[in-house]
Amino acid sequence: MRAQRGLILLLLLLAVFCSTAVSLKCYNCLDPVSSCKINTTCSPNLDSCLYAVAGRQVYQQCWKLSDCNSNYIMSRLDVAGIQSKCCQWDLCNKNLDGLEEPNNAETSSLRKTALLGTSVLVAILKFCF
């Protein structure tokens, strides 16, 4: 019975940590007139944010990192001569210039939370089994 409760607790913790780990937020605008302020939470299969420019057309949206190459993006968006970047942290696709990973407290605290969560899960596994 004790092992069963431990397993249930472990599964609940995994669900919480896994759901927060894949919740990437990206700007989501097609050719914004001014700075894009609309953001969305990406689905788990879309693991990066795309910022692409073709002439005056701007694309900001969730994207699959493995599909982040110019030829694929041009064919998918049906445009030519595109400049694009993909990134993998929240709201990183504001513009082409700002696609460097931030070194701030928010990013650091997310990594610390993930490390703490992993440590807690290991402790629970050792305690219950």
From Swiss-Prot:
UniProt key word Membrane: yes
UniProt cross-references to InterPro entries, sorted A to Z: CD59, LY6_UPA_recep-like, Snake_toxin-like_sf
One Pfam family here: CD59
SUPFAM superfamilies listed in its UniProt record: Snake toxin-like
Tissues where the protein occurs: Widely expressed in the kidneys, brain, lungs, spleen and testis Testis-specific.
GO BP field: negative regulation of activation of membrane attack complex; negative regulation of complement activation
UniProt PTM: N- and O-glycosylated.
Covalently lipidated residues, kind GPI-anchor amidated asparagine: N104
Disulfide feature: C26-C49, C29-C36, C42-C62, C68-C86, C87-C92
Annotated keywords: Cell membrane, Disulfide bond, Glycoprotein, GPI-anchor, Lipoprotein, Membrane, Secreted, Signal
Domain UPAR/Ly6: residue ranges: 24-107
Role this protein plays: Potent inhibitor of the complement membrane attack complex (MAC) action, which protects self-cells from damage during complement activation. Acts by binding to the beta-haipins of C8 (C8A and C8B) components of the assembling MAC, forming an intermolecular beta-sheet that prevents incorporation of the multiple copies of C9 required for complete formation of the osmolytic pore.
Name of the protein this chain belongs to: CD59B glycoprotein
